[in-house]
Amino acid sequence: MAGGAITPDSLIGLIAEINEIPGNFGLFKKDCSDLARRVGLLTHLIEEIRDSSPPSESDASSSLNSHECDWWSDLVVGLQAAKRLLSSATSFQARESSDGAAKRISFQFQCVTWKLEKALGDLTYDRYDISDEVREQVELARLQLRRAMQRYGSLNSKKFSSGLSEPMEKDASSNRKVIEKLESIPETVHSLSDEKKFESPPPWKSSSVSLAFFLSKDGDDERLEKAVTENSDDSQKSDNLTIPEDFLCPISLELMKDPAIVSTGQTYERSFIQRWIDCGNLSCPKTQQKLENFTLTPNYVLRSLISQWCTKHNIEQPGGYMNGRTKNSDGSFRDLSGDMSAIRALVCKLSSQSIEDRRTAVSEIRSLSKRSTDNRILIAEAGAIPVLVKLLTSDGDTETQENAVTCILNLSIYEHNKELIMLAGAVTSIVLVLRAGSMEARENAAATLFSLSLADENKIIIGASGAIMALVDLLQYGSVRGKKDAATALFNLCIYQGNKGRAVRAGIVKPLVKMLTDSSSERMADEALTILSVLASNQVAKTAILRANAIPPLIDCLQKDQPRNRENAAAILLCLCKRDTEKLISIGRLGAVVPLMELSRDGTERAKRKANSLLELLRKSSRKLGSL
């Protein structure tokens, strides 16, 4: 089950613990009771997921499994944050706390609400045997969470303007030495407000606010817990070690890997504060002061202190590379300063006035980025990504463009680099390559979009960029490899509900249905069925699939195709024919009953469920006709 060590049973127990938290009779009484009630609605969902057979594994479902893991992890994180928040809010004393403390708790309610709504929105019901009653409960919970998000609105609420003015007494910090070091940072570091900003900040989704786990001043160990741990020994050490508060991003409460200073002098993890700003917030999250500008200045002093602290406590350093060293699998460190010097020299050549120098440098970086994760980390650390993005639009230099987009593809394999690529505004340039580049460049552009779209928030950005229409064009007219790359990217993008309508409007359905009847050696029925199975849950897509006369080829797939394809064909037919007696009669006349009965006996667990559901609907429609 996705989510690592967090099983459905343990999650049910967590929900029970949340519901057992004593009710609050103070300022946050309604917030606490509302959140606990919404969480309680999820019990039956987790129980049915627990009782469902796990989805079958196959090559075509690898991306879907990744998505499944993402939504489950989001749910786990959201529920754990909800428990911590309710425990904090119920013990909140207005008279003993500052206005800022109340605002932080209000901000946490907003963040936890968003996280839970996002997790439920990403749930794909067809992956599990979820009853209609439970679906209605989940949709009710989502509706309530969305309404709550609208109610919380701006963080500059006047709700706490009275009765909360007494200052919070500062506890003696166990990390005073660290704080003193930070306070001694020269003012020049804070005044670097003229540093160049990213030219194209990403249009992060308007409703997204990064999750604030717990913005209390207490250095408790609970906020260090991880839903999934890669190594039990390392996990045990982390649980027993309190990270200095100044090393944690005030928004995410995670150890910072790229600390950046805003105009108020506060430091945040760059990606989180960038998302905060992109959501339209004009104030500093911690101080609520208005930001004079949106320049994010690197805090190199704090980054160095974090590196030293990680080394001292034998903790893996965020970002994988700091101060010229990278951590090996055995826990030892390897010096990469020599490699870094060579890579920096190559990155400098990327901006050379000489076309030949640029071509040579980008070709070498392409080769290096293909070889190892260390190289991908170093190349990104050397600042190559923004320069490579500029090279994507090299006029008339096809070779440089091909190598640049391939470099970005290779770099995106490393998870942290995905974020840097998005922050560099790469999507717009990648889409331009996808539309007008050479075939090799278009293939690699499609593969890059797939890689970037593995992060849920990126699905939204890529979908809004015009990429889907360009991918559909490649799906129809590209090379064999280009078609497969386009299909993979389209499948992943269409997992997000908002992109399904875009794909239909871009004309995706007709080429997919055509692929079902293609008898050539380049047949892509597997890819077509996988994408159609994702689209079919959308009403606009469902109408388009029916208009494309997809039912006959789908029934053919039921009769003679591979097990995975038969499973997807049954799932699509169920979506198309549910609550439509006319369509049920049609598939019965076209010979669907016999292959469905075979599938209900011999298919995968998911295929059996879909086949049995269709057969039951066929029986009901037959009895209904007989009674007329």
Swiss-Prot record:
E.C. no: 2.3.2.27
MF annotations from Gene Ontology: ubiquitin-protein transferase activity
Signal peptide: none
CDD domains: RING-Ubox_PUB (cd16664)
PROSITE patterns, A to Z: ARM_REPEAT, U_BOX
Domain spans labelled U-box: 242-316
One GO-annotated biological process of the protein: protein destabilization
InterPro entries membership: ARM-like (IPR011989), ARM-type_fold (IPR016024), Armadillo (IPR000225), RING-Ubox_PUB (IPR045210), Ubox_domain (IPR003613), Znf_RING/FYVE/PHD (IPR013083)
Key words of the record: Repeat, Transferase, Ubl conjugation pathway
Coiled coil: none
Catalysed reaction equations from the record: S-ubiquitinyl-[E2 ubiquitin-conjugating enzyme]-L-cysteine + [acceptor protein]-L-lysine = [E2 ubiquitin-conjugating enzyme]-L-cysteine + N(6)-ubiquitinyl-[acceptor protein]-L-lysine
ARM repeat extents: 373-413, 415-454, 456-495, 497-537, 539-578
Pathway: Protein modification; protein ubiquitination
One cellular component term from this protein's GO annotations in UniProt: nucleus
The protein's role, per its UniProt record: Functions as an E3 ubiquitin ligase.
UniProt name for this protein: U-box domain-containing protein 10
Organism: Arabidopsis thaliana (Mouse-ear cress)
